[in-house]
Amino acid sequence: MAAVLTREEIEPVLTGTKFHQFLGIRLEEVNEQSVTIRLPYNELFYTSADGYIHGGILATVIDIAGYFAVFSQLNQPVPTVDLKIDYLRPGRAGDLLFTASVVKLGRSVSIADIVAADTSGKAVAIGRGLFSSKQE
């Protein structure tokens, strides 16, 4: 297996997408086991009625984190095939950290597990993504 991509190799890909720029996500950490992405607090992402982050935002960044965990290992586009999210508790105002770990690197499909947590480490959602890792 090739070496894991470095922060310097991943960051331009992550931040070069206009949608990612809108979200404000930042690469927090990259290592051989995982990728961590920070979603800074943005009041636009929270419901006005109860002050919790919208589940669609959580799902979106879970997907992005899983993608980059697999991408960091394969250095090729890995489109999402399937995504499962379990919402554990309401995400209150504040930054969130999304840590994705590769469970399996396959010839056709790879799997990543993702934890979305507040800055105290309390998980607000977990996800599992399946990503197409087929070589073209």
Where are these regions (language model features)?
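Terminal targeting signals and extreme-terminal segments of soluble enzymes
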Residues: 1-136
